[in-house]
Amino acid sequence: MLVRNAQLQVVSTQPLIARLLEDALHARLPEFPAVSLVLDWPVGFAFQMVTPESAASSFVLTQNACPEYLDDLWNLGLLGLAYRSRTLEELAELLRRAETRERVRLTPAQRSPLTPAEGDLLRLVSRGLANKEIARELGIANQTVQNGLTRVFQKLGVSSRNEAILYYWDIANKPPIQ
């Protein structure tokens, strides 16, 4: 619901940017929904800040175009997820839509080539887990992890664990998203 004089919270590692963005959005929305706008910079910041309790009232704005990363953010149960910079008017419109609690996802249409199980492997590798830790976490055999990672590397066109990690965190050289 829209709340007059409620505080829109912009969550960022840069307090000045957060304050300026809050002021600019308040000027465009005299009444605004009670939501948190999380600026996912550096990449991964949103995973630290969004909790299961806060996800349903959180919008995340990210620069990471990795489809698996975007899916992982969305699967937190976010109210909204947007890729790349938006104009202040676009951000204000996203926040207006929050009144209905309609989930909004404005991300590239590119879909992951990975199965859900392979996506789990990529996510855990990208968080620094070793194969044995991944096997324990997923309740599968170490050899299953190794075989699965081989398929992940093939599908992503990477040749190593390190390249897969760089891909997930959107640091690898990839073709630009349109």
Language-model regions, residue ranges each:
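Recognition helix of helix-turn-helix DNA-binding domains
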Residues: 128-163, 167
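Hydrophobic patch in the ABC ATPase nucleotide-binding domain
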Residues: 100, 114, 158
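…primarily DNA-binding HTH/wHTH and HhH modules…
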Residues: 171-178
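Helix-turn-helix DNA-binding segment
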Residues: 105-144
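Short, polar/charged, Gly/Pro-enriched helix-capping and turn/loop motifs at alpha-helix termini
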Residues: 105-109, 159, 178
